[in-house]
């Protein structure tokens, strides 16, 4: 009886969708954020402003549901694994 109960518990756990959540870097300090269930991508957005020559490109990082389309002056990089969006070099 105990074996049957244990088997049922193991099968139940294996069949459940345990709700994997993605984590993405959210800033230059490499802190991570847990993405909402509908956000299945990590994204890094870079662009230049008037101080780009002195300070380097501006940067936004985090979770997203879709990878934005490329636009003039903006660069997007998207990926699908935990913390796969490091600060560009």
From Swiss-Prot:
Keywords: Acetylcholine receptor inhibiting toxin, Disulfide bond, Ion channel impairing toxin, Neurotoxin, Postsynaptic neurotoxin, Secreted, Signal, Toxin
Subcellular localization, as worded in the UniProt entry: Secreted
Protein name listed in UniProt: Long neurotoxin homolog Pa ID
Species: Pseudechis australis (Mulga snake)
Tissue/organ expression: Expressed by the venom gland.
Family label: Belongs to the three-finger toxin family. Long-chain subfamily. Type II alpha-neurotoxin sub-subfamily.
Chief location category: secreted
Recorded coiled-coil stretches: none
Region forming the signal peptide: 1-21
Residue ranges of the TM segments: none
Cellular component GO terms held in the UniProt record: extracellular region
Function (record text): Binds with high affinity to muscular (alpha-1/CHRNA1) and neuronal (alpha-7/CHRNA7) nicotinic acetylcholine receptor (nAChR) and inhibits acetylcholine from binding to the receptor, thereby impairing neuromuscular and neuronal transmission.
GO function terms (MF aspect): acetylcholine receptor inhibitor activity; ion channel regulator activity; toxin activity
Other remarks on this protein: Negative results: does not show binding activity to the acetylcholine receptor of an electric ray eel nor lethal effect on mice.
InterPro entries, alphabetized: Snake_3FTx, Snake_toxin-like_sf, Snake_toxin_con_site, Toxin_cobra-type
């Amino acid at each position: 009886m105990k074996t049957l109960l244990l088997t049922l518990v193991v099968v139940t756990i294996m069949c459940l969708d345990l709700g994997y959540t993605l984590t993405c870097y959210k800033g230059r300090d490499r802190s991570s954020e847990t993405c909402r269930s509908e956000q299945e991508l990590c994204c890094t957005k870079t662009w230049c402003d008037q101080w780009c020559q002195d300070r380097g490109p501006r940067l936004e990082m985090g979770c997203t549901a879709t990878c934005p389309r490329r636009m003039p002056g903006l660069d997007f990089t998207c990926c699908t694994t935990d913390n796969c969006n490091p600060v560009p070099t």
